[in-house]
Amino acid sequence: MAKRVQHEGGDYRPKKRSKNERNGEGSRISATAEAVRNEPDSKPDATYVQSPALGDLSQIEIDQFLAKHCIKVTDSSEAPPLRPIMSFSHLPSSFSKIYDPLSSFSSPTPIQSATWPLLFAGRDVIGIAETGSGKTLAFGLPCIKKILDSGKVKRKHARPAAVIISPTRELAMQIYDQLSKFGASVDIRVTCIYGGVKKDEQREALKTAAIVVATPGRLKDLKDDGSVDLGKVKYLVLDEADRMLDKGFEQDIKDIIRSTPDSTRQTVMFTATWPPSVRDLAASFMTSAVTVTIGGDPSADPRANTRIKQVVEVVKPQEKEARLVQLLSRSQRGAAVGDKVLVFCLYKKEAVRVERLLRSKNFKVAGIHGDLNQHERFKSLEAFKTGSATVLVATDVAARGLDIPSVKLVINVTFPLTVEDYVHRIGRTGRAGADGHAITLFTEADKAQSGALINVLRAAKQDVPDALLKFGTTVKKKQHGAYGAFFKDVDTSKSATKIVFDE
């Protein structure tokens, strides 16, 4: 059997098997799916009835809400604008049972308020918002309601009604955890598909799942071997689309989309940035999409969450680890002794060294980086989430997608490759309307990034230390589309690994 090559984020791409090597069930599913695919199908008209209470609000109140939350809605069609759902009481009254888990939240987030009416109305939507803005429920609630409206909650074969694609297994698991809570109340089954584990259990779960949350590589593999048919998908979501393109999944995504029905599919894309590559992808498969932007121009320079207090300390390289210990000692005492702190390193070896250092200083610490297997990563994340570890040392593999509640402080021991990655790192704190705090240890070795960092600080109205200004304010653009933020996470001092395939 061929050795497997692990793609970033743990999404494995095994060598394709011949039809004779596949189990008989996969072939049976494929044959049945083809028969169903050829059945006539039509897209039911989506119905969205605006709440009377929402209709009673004045246009001035609506405009003030949009301005307060920096919400911009761009719609090239001639459809009348839909008012944002500003309160949970404004949600459609039908199937109100699915709203029960919302009782733990006070009000919708801006991205939820703006996208819900559009998605309930059946429109294709592009949502552009910072991480931690509530995007999962923004696309998740309309997904569940769409399945309920169709009356086809139960699935007897591997033909899901909705597919949600995410860049990493961790993010896929987080989406699954949230949607399962809402789906359980109305008997809608959700399953999570990702690489690095055996496929047999996933094939079994696919038989009854109405919603499939998946990483692109594993979903494509299961589609190609006949284990799942996407011909009845009514609702397709690409979450963190920019991240998936950075990781090289564009062809997998396009192949998956081509397997879903164009005329009957509602398509949703969420992204933190809006580069040309993401625009081109959206233009290739979305129909008259409405674009909802939260915050400033997403194609402009990256902007940090203004609720995060950013502190930059210019230090000598040899001082960083001692300073880290001081910062943690100060932040992990008194009433804050149990506060969660996320510590970012650039290299895997650096992360291992820092984790050992902090453990030797009696901090409750866990680590997550590319060298850990799936079980070890989940164990570390669970320890951090439950509080048995209050400090998590991570490389950029954890910089996007991880939704860890109540991270009080982010510390950058080493500045990342780009300022975009800096913004994503510190975005782990200050989520869901909370305030956050980020401290960055900046050295002369990072001076090429000083100008871009200064721009981020100024845009968020943060203090810029004189020591940082001395490095200069020139911004040097740096593209790394092929490798994203991860190529420095590889030890380049080693020779390349030779991959050998068995006969």
Swiss-Prot record:
Keywords linked to the UniProt accession: ATP-binding, Helicase, Hydrolase, Nucleotide-binding, Nucleus, Ribosome biogenesis, RNA-binding, rRNA processing
Basic and acidic residues composition bias: residue spans: 1-13
Catalytic activity: ATP + H2O = ADP + phosphate + H(+)
CDD domains named in the record: DEADc, SF2_C_DEAD
PROSITE patterns named in the record: DEAD_ATP_HELICASE, HELICASE_ATP_BIND_1, HELICASE_CTER
Main EC class the enzyme belongs to: hydrolase
Domain Helicase ATP-binding: 116-292
Residues involved in ATP binding: A129, E130, T131, G132, S133, G134, K135, T136
EC number: 3.6.4.13
Chain span(s) of sequence motif DEAD box: 239-242
Domain Helicase C-terminal residues, every copy: 307-472
Family: Belongs to the DEAD box helicase family. DDX5/DBP2 subfamily.
Function, in words: ATP-dependent RNA helicase required for 60S ribosomal subunit synthesis. Involved in efficient pre-rRNA processing, predominantly at site A3, which is necessary for the normal formation of 25S and 5.8S rRNAs.
Protein name: ATP-dependent RNA helicase dbp3
Organism: Aspergillus fumigatus (strain ATCC MYA-4609 / CBS 101355 / FGSC A1100 / Af293) (Neosartorya fumigata)
Encoding gene per record: dbp3
